[in-house]
């Protein structure tokens, strides 16, 4: 379990464009984007035999801000993985991993072009499509490792 609160210090800037328009940003004391305040990680594993291991991984990421102004954010989410690893012999390992076995859906990271959106402006983006990163979908992955 981790609780953290990283904030920006001395993070402000302004610019005047050729047409005289001015724009500025002040992120002082705002929580760093993409860094959740709460992290929980649970990683149980069980050796069924000395050559066969079953494992799970549950990772919780709390509310995460998507831009500098703390105007856009992602709700907390779980990321889940699980798998089986089998050491067939001293030269061959086989594995299967299931990614996102709870089939969680949602976005993470940042939203492109949103850096300067303020809390007052955020409501105008409700219901709009925006580009960003998304949670990995439910997948099953197979692996083999051969040692000489």
What are these regions (language model features)?
Residues 25-30, 66-71, 81, 127-132:
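Extracellular loop and loop/strand-boundary signature of outer-membrane beta-barrel proteins
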Residues 11-22, 62, 71-76, 110-120:
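Flexible, surface-exposed loop regions and adjacent strand-edge segments
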Residues 51-53, 77-81, 91-93, 139:
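Active-site lining segments that contact anionic ligands and/or coordinate catalytic metals
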């Amino acid at each position: 379990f981790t609780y953290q609160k990283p904030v920006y210090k001395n993070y402000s800037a302004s610019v005047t464009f050729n047409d005289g328009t001015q724009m500025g940003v002040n992120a002082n004391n705002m929580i760093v984007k993409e860094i959740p305040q709460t992290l929980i990680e649970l990683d149980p594993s069980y050796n069924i035999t000395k050559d066969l291991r079953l494992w799970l991984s549950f990772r919780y990421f709390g509310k995460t801000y998507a831009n500098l102004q703390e105007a856009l954010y992602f709700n907390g989410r779980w990321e889940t993985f699980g798998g089986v690893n089998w050491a067939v012999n001293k030269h061959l390992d086989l594995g299967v991993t299931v990614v996102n076995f709870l089939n969680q859906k949602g976005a993470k990271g940042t939203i492109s072009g949103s850096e300067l959106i303020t809390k007052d402006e955020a409501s105008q983006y409700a219901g709009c499509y925006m580009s960003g990163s998304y949670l990995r979908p439910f997948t099953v992955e197979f692996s083999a490792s051969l040692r000489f």
